[in-house]
Amino acid sequence: MVVLAASIISKSGKALVSRQFVDMSRIRIDGLLAAFPKLVGSGKQHTYVETENVRYVYQPIEALYLLLITNKQSNILEDLDTLRLLSKLIPEYAPSLDEEGVCKAAFELLFAFIEAISLGNKENVTVAQVKQYCEMESHEEKLHKLVMQSKINETKDVMRRKVTEIEKSKTDRGKPDKGGFGSLRTPNSFSDMGIRGGGPGGDPIFGDMDSFTHKAKGRPSAPAPASASTKVPGGMKLSKAQKTNQFLESLKAEGEVILEDTQPSATQSRSSYIPPSDPITVTIEEKLNVTVKRDGGVSNFDIQGTLALQILNDTDGFIQLQIENQDVPGLNFKTHPNINKELFNSQQIVGAKDPNRPFPSGQNETPLVKWRIQELNESSLPLAVNCWPSVSGNETYVNIEYEASEMFDLHNVVISIPLPALREAPGVRQIDGEWRYDSRNSVLEWSIILVDQSNRSGSLEFTVPAADPSTFFPISVGFSASNTFSDLKVTAIRPLREGSPPKFSQRNRLVTYNYQVV
């Protein structure tokens, strides 16, 4: 008995996994596998088929064929026994009995074939033995990994305790109030928002509504200036943390892979934060939630906007904002409960119900107005993406094009196309922009840094092995822009007390929250 090759192929003859047990060129094995589907008659129940030189012993597995190529002198009964063994091994390693599942487990299947067949002859093994041989677990290796992992965990615990002590000491130093703003909170919605304490000349305009807000951990809103120069109690304890760092470096030098916690500490967050240069900053942001049908039409087009205010100095909190916006169909505003709604609806002025209470100050933004737009159609999309996959022979040709609206200049555009499981990157034939293949998630990312008047449209063309057209959906799109649909802006800031209007800056941005073609 001589098994020339053991293979898994599709019904069209596409080779997914193949292991040769004799010297055979790539061209010859490709020719033998491609010729097999033509030899198998439809409706026949045979388990083998012969040609002048070789014999095919096969077994259908859903939409695939498990195939043994042998010489004509081999024992057909032993060939069938080998085929049965391999058919039991495939479900043990492949997550699903289709092209994608087999390709994902290609190497595991090859190793299993090698354990089951040696030099073209079947080994006297069972499925359980093959699995054991492929795993090749080592008790010594497991013990070594457990010891090293325990050392790493112990080191991380020491580091966490030190970080906690440092953060606690910094928090204790920042407890003295400045102007009464003891706990600045980060609001997330209209229903309830709160900042406790009081500013000079009056109480803050926002009450304490705990269901809405959450405190910024370990971060005082306005620490006293003297605390900046205060020495950290027990600061010399950092030398112990330095020893733990040296221990981690020694582990890395021995080739150990150490997974550090990626969550930054509060100290790192504060050091990387760039404070605004102007005393008052207004941020206007709109988020897109769009679902476009691949055949045309929009199933969801939702825009949610927010106007947020950040004031650095307590004395600048007694102000009102004059705004204006474009008349957009379906635009609905909603103000914070402590904002004067009558003043906003009649004159488009954002001001507090009680003018004697200031807006809160600090490093956090306070949302004042929110809005929603829901009555736009497909013609208002900032970016339209069309995908045209077509199967030709053993390949799928995919053409993707985008068309951008004249209303927006889009920055950092990324179009992510899902692909079938591939051994190699797709063959990109033409592209306007850059591309990157994420092999881990099997996604092709098409990137354009800027879409403006010079490139309102563009295309991408690539090829992959034959696949179902639905494989390339849903397509995810991400981008940002410096103008918004509502075109809302603050035209002036009016002080409620004597003095000149404070200087302010304004930031407008349109971002994608969920933008897909399905």
From Swiss-Prot:
Compositionally biased spans, kind Low complexity: 220-229
Entries under Pfam families matching the protein: Adap_comp_sub
CDD domains reported for this sequence: AP_delta-COPI_MHD, Delta_COP_N
Residue segments, region Disordered: 165-235
InterPro entries with a match to the protein in the record: AP2_Mu_C_sf, Coatomer_dsu, Longin-like_dom_sf, MHD
Membrane topology: Peripheral membrane protein
Compartments where found: Cytoplasm; Golgi apparatus membrane; Cytoplasmic vesicle, COPI-coated vesicle membrane
Biased composition (Gly residues): 195-204
Family as reported in the entry's similarity comment: Belongs to the adaptor complexes medium subunit family. Delta-COP subfamily.
Function: The coatomer is a cytosolic protein complex that binds to dilysine motifs and reversibly associates with Golgi non-clathrin-coated vesicles, which further mediate biosynthetic protein transport from the ER, via the Golgi up to the trans Golgi network. Coatomer complex is required for budding from Golgi membranes, and is essential for the retrograde Golgi-to-ER transport of dilysine-tagged proteins.
PANTHER family tied to this protein: COATOMER SUBUNIT DELTA, COATOMER SUBUNIT DELTA-3
Protein name: Coatomer subunit delta-3
Organism this protein belongs to: Oryza sativa subsp. japonica
